[in-house]
């Protein structure tokens, strides 16, 4: 009887581990098709904060401080490269334009990424920290 209980306990542990494995992996895998919001305060006079969304095929939508553009991302285990399309002309104040240019340059220089729960960090010349949108 004790051996039967022990076997059932082992079986229960194995089933639980099997079911929990994919959930844990998805918690640490790249969050494709999810909006990633830059972990910074909005600029004075605005509520807008930059957001990037990368589809599983690598298509990227990049919303900067003022302008928006598209691009292509290549993601593999812990490496990432982002190539952004040209930003269409927009009417922005000089401070927002400068911040757009700086952020876009930082995005195109990222080389690695890592995820810890709801936080995704892009690492390169400048570390960029994003939070998963949970709305």
Task: Indicate where each model-derived feature is located.
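Lipid interaction determinants
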Residues: 2-5, 10, 18-135
